Swiss-Prot record:
Induction: Expression is highly up-regulated under low oxygen and low sterol conditions in a sre1- and scp1-dependent manner. Belongs to the sterol desaturase family. This is C-4 methylsterol oxidase erg25. The histidine box domains may contain the active site and/or be involved in metal ion binding. GO terms for biological process: ergosterol biosynthetic process. Signal peptide: none annotated. It comes from Schizosaccharomyces pombe (strain 972 / ATCC 24843). The chain crosses the membrane at residues 186-206.
Length: 300
């Protein structure tokens, strides 16, 4: 929808939204807010950059806070994958400091370049938004493509100088926790993060069919996945219990504990096909056998 010729009276956000609502009654409330936001700023670089950065911070730390609360509650230890390694407040604070430093020094400059990248690759910011069904299948595709990128890039980071000088930073915590999802070397943040950002951008470049709001929903879900896979808990209601191909915290926690194998981000099949999960399955079998043996002795 082209609204560049519309005359808006007043500069307040609410006044702009109300006028646009009268001009475009066919738009839903969220679409009206979206349009009013861009009209209010009247600067797409600032509007998109600010929204992108705030979205990232709110989603990332907002998702981490529940896991911090869970870590502080002994009741949940029964589902902690490494129950003897609960992060201390000092560890979480130290992790938060480095994560915030990387957000403001590494990610913020990239985020402020996001609107020019959107324009270059052809992302739409107009209203109305695309149908929900289109968003769902595009985001599903991005999950599969990002998982492929992540597997191979992550596996590369476990070789020689790539691990010693870059990826070793992320492996500081052998028992990961939610906040540690983005505790990483700047080069790792850029290269692994490329799967999240540039996969959709390249899709848009070749298809000319992607909306910024779809991109935001995708990034939100990807942040949820990253934080949850580092949280260190495997609940009976975890997604991998209902979707067996989903990796989840159980899959990634072993990677941090053993410093090898299980290189995928969201799914399990790359590790299964290339047999980089064999040690993981052997470890789980030994742990299960030890559990049964302990229960048998207790029953006697």
């Amino acid at each position: 929808m082209n609204t560049t010729s519309e005359v808006i009276v007043g500069t307040g956000f609410q006044a702009i939204r109300q006028q646009l609502a009268q001009m475009h009654p066919e738009l839903n409330f969220v679409e009206q807010l979206w349009l009013a936001y861009y009209k209010w700023f009247d600067n797409d670089v600032v509007a998109t950059g600010l929204m992108s950065f705030l979205l990232h911070e709110l989603i990332y730390f907002g998702r981490c806070i529940p896991w911090m609360i869970i870590d502080a509650m002994p009741y949940f230890r029964r589902w902690k994958i490494q129950p003897k390694k609960v992060p201390t407040l000092a560890e979480q604070w130290e992790c938060t400091r480095l994560v915030l430093l990387s957000h403001f020094t590494v990610e913020l400059p990239q985020i402020w370049l996001f609107d020019p990248m959107c324009a270059t690759f052809g992302l739409s910011t107009s209203v109305p938004f695309p149908p929900v069904t289109k968003m769902i299948w595009q985001i599903t595709l991005f999950f599969f493509l990002e998982d492929t990128w992540h597997y191979w890039a992550h596996r590369l980071f476990h070789y020689g100088i790539f691990y010693r000088f870059i990826h070793k930073v992320h492996h500081r915590y052998s028992a990961p926790f939610g906040l540690s999802a983005e505790y990483a070397h700047p080069l790792e943040i850029i290269l692994l993060g490329a799967g999240t950002v540039f996969v959709p951008l390249m899709w848009c470049y070749f298809t000319h069919d992607l909306h910024l709001v779809t991109m935001y929903i995708w990034i939100t879900l990807r942040l949820f996945q990253a934080v949850d896979s580092h949280a260190g808990y495997d609940f009976p209601w975890s997604l991998n219990k209902f979707l067996p191909i989903w990796a989840g915290a159980d899959h990634h926690d072993y990677h941090h504990m053993a410093f090898k194998d299980n290189f995928s981000s969201s799914f399990r099949w790359w590790d299964a096909v290339l047999k980089t999960d064999q040690n993981y399955h052997q470890f789980k079998a030994r742990r299960l056998a030890a559990k049964y043996e302990a229960e048998s002795k207790k029953a006697k």
